Amino acid sequence: MYGINGIYNFVTEKDKNMEKEKTVRLIYPQWQGASVVDLLPELKNDPAEASRGYYLGAQLLNFLAPDRGQETLTVPISTDMTDREVTDGVIDRDAILSQSKAALEMLRAANPDRIITLGGECSVSVVPFTYLADKYKGDVAMIWIDAHPDLTLPGDVYPGYHAMAATACMGYGEKQLISVLPAKIDPSKVLLVGIRNWERDEIKVRQQQYGIPNITGEEVADNSDAIREWLRSCGASKVVIHFDMDVLDPAEIIAAVGTDPDGMKMEQVIRVINDIAAEKEVVGLTVAEAMPRTAIRIKNMLNRLPLLK
C-alpha cells in the first residue's frame, strides 16, 4: 500500500537516477478561472472568499507537500475581486492572460525538465503542460484525473477558464489565451480518468468528437491495467498528469469544490499515479482545485477577533 505521500515518490526516485535533470515546484494560486460560490453554500454570503479559497488552497498544498529541495517558483496572482467581467467568453480573461504570460516567462527562465504544479483551480495545468509539450517536441501524453472533463469552450454556458483547461491544453479556446501558449497536446494523446459528471450533453458530444477516451473510476478500482494499456499505445514516452482533487470520493474526504458522489478513493488515485509513473516518464504533475472550506471559515473567524482584525 502506498503511503499518503505516494504521489510524490516518483519525483524523488527519478531525481536520484537523473541528477542532471531539473525539477521545479510551481506554486500557482490562480483563482480567476472559477466562479463557484453556488457550490459552496457555507460561503454564499461572501463570493470573494469562495473564489479566493483557491489561493489559500495552493498555499496549503505547498505547506503539506513534502519538501524535496526542488527550486520553488511562485506565480504572482492578483487578489483583486472588483469588477469581474466576462471577456470573449472567459471570466477574468485579462487577469488570466497576464498571469499565464508571467508563469510561462518564469518557466522559460528556469528551464526545468519536470514540473510539479500546486494550484489553484484547474487552469494552472495549462501553462506548465504546454511548456513541457514544447520542450519535448510533442512526445508527451496527458492524463486528466478529474470528476469533470474540463472540455468547455468560450461561448458555453459557464465562462470559467478552469472548465476549459483540458481544451486549452489541446490548443482550443479563447484566441488570446491560446496564442501565448508554446505548444498544444494532440487529442490522440489525451486520456480522461475518473470522469463522472459531464454536466451537459454537449460536453460529452465534444469529448466524442475529439476522440478522447474516459476510463472510469470503477475500471481502475482494483488495478490500473486499462491505463497501462492506453499508455502503451499512446505514442509518447513521457506523460503529464493532472490531478483534480474533486475526483476523490466525498464520502471519504471533501477536499475540493465538487462533491459528486461515488468518486475514487485516495489510495486508488495514489496507486494509479504511481502505476503511470512506472509505465512512462512523468515530467509534469499538477494537484489542483484544493478548496479548504474549514480553513477559510477559521480565517474569517480570526479576521473578526480583537487585536487581529
What is each model feature region?
Residues 1-17:
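N-terminal amphipathic/basic-hydrophobic helices that include classical n-h-c signal peptides
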Residues 144-147, 170, 192-197, 216-218, ...:
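Short, structured patches in soluble enzyme cores that scaffold and shape functional sites
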Residues 19-116, 128-137, 209-309:
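Catalytic cores of soluble, metal-dependent hydrolases
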Residues 114-179, 280-283:
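Active-site histidine-anchored catalytic micro-motif
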Residues 119-125, 197-198, 291-293:
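Gly/Ser/Thr-rich loops at beta-strand to alpha-helix junctions
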Residues 147-151, 197, 245-247, 292:
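Short, glycine/acidic-enriched loop or turn micro-motifs at the edges of active sites
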Residues 198-205:
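Short, glycine/polar-rich helix-capping loops at beta-to-alpha or helix-loop-helix junctions
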Residues 29, 119-122, 147, 195, ...:
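Short, well-ordered beta-to-alpha junction loops that form the rim of enzyme active sites
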